[in-house]
């Protein structure tokens, strides 16, 4: 799935869309934890979900500062992110992790763009860069774990 998050014209719009994207990611992580068979994979994925939970908290604080709405759940894209995981679960852990890696592509791209957004304040840029580093780490682990399974 190709994301347009990070291309918003305003910082408040960007923060709102990042919050939606994070909620979509969290829903996919919950599906993944439920469907993975390998307990070590479940544990690692749960740790990554905690990163996404932290991203929502940090973005919610930033939203208050920039006058953005704090969404409490994802949007229609959530059906795509969770649907990929549900379908992949029929083929096992490797397929689930591959589906999650493709979901991580969107978050990596979104935070990379957000870090370069023209209206990003130094505080916002710090939040975006830290989240981007998390997403790169998640994507790399998903790729390696899917290949090893």
Features from the language model and the residues they span:
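Conserved alpha-helical segments that form or flank metal/cofactor-binding pockets of metalloenzymes
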Residues: 40-76, 138-149
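Generic structural concept
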Residues: 19, 23, 33, 49, ...
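Alpha-helical scaffold segments that form or flank carboxylate-/histidine-based iron centers
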Residues: 9-18, 38-57, 93-99, 122-136
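Alpha-helical bundle segments that constitute or directly flank the non-heme di-iron/ferroxidase center
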Residues: 2-36, 94-119
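Carboxylate-rich helix-loop segments that flank metal/cofactor sites and access channels
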Residues: 57-108
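Membrane-interacting alpha-helical segments
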Residues: 1-12, 66, 86-93, 145-149
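Preference for long, well-ordered alpha-helical segments
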Residues: 103-149
């Amino acid at each position: 799935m190709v994301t347009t998050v990070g291309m918003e014209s305003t910082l408040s719009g960007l923060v709102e869309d990042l919050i939606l994207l994070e909620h979509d990611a969290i829903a996919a992580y919950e599906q993944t934890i439920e469907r993975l068979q390998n307990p070590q994979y479940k544990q690692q994925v749960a740790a990554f979900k905690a990163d996404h939970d932290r991203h929502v908290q940090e973005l919610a604080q930033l939203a208050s500062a920039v006058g953005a709405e704090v969404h409490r759940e994802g949007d229609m894209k959530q059906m795509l992110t969770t649907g990929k995981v549900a379908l992949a679960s029929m083929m096992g852990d490797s397929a689930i992790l591959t589906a999650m890696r493709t979901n991580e592509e969107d978050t990596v791209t979104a935070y990379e763009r957000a870090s370069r957004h023209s209206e990003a304040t130094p505080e916002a840029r710090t939040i975006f860069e830290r989240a981007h580093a998390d997403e790169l780490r998640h994507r790399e682990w998903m790729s390696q774990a899917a290949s090893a399974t």
